[in-house]
Amino acid sequence: WKNDRNVTGKPYLGPYDNSNVNVINQHIDWAKQAGIDYFIYSWLGTNKKEHGPETKITNNFIRQTNIINYKIMPLYETPLALNQSPDNIDFDQKYWPSVTAGDQFIKDMLAFSTQAHNTDHSDHFLRINNCPRVALYLARNMLNQDKYFKKLKTELANRNQCLDFTADVTFWNSSDKPMARSKQSAEEQWAWLANNFSAVFGYNMYSN
């Protein structure tokens, strides 16, 4: 906006702060007028040391949507949250010296589940069959994830909790390869997705 407003134009609200309560409320009002039932927000996990400013904005958004009871669900920014390449999100790789990316994934999901199940005024989190819903960005590029999903399911069951996952796998590539890094057959890949996700979506619809 500052460099070339004639080309990029100017937002209706002007150059704004997306953590401003009035800005959040205005966007929700517009969404309601357009018949939009909920917002998906970017979530970078629980590492506040790495993502402090983003976490502050996210938490403010969650509080405000709670006040006016507007439905929301997180889009887990998998490569950023797990400090992995977006092309190969290997859950067995180290996140910390003694913590794998898969371990951090479990920690993040359990933290969200606790927030969505147990905190006061958490009814505005979108749910499917009473399970808070989470979208996983670039699920198609995950590697070595199965054992961590199994461990997460066990941990959630022990807490009498559940999560409903949506997978970003839809791409211009062949449907025979929904999990781009997997060596399993297409049938096995789709079976794994069906066992761990309730829906699929496409974040980016483009290809080389």
Residue ranges and their predicted role:
Residues 1-208:
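Glycan-processing catalytic domains of CAZymes
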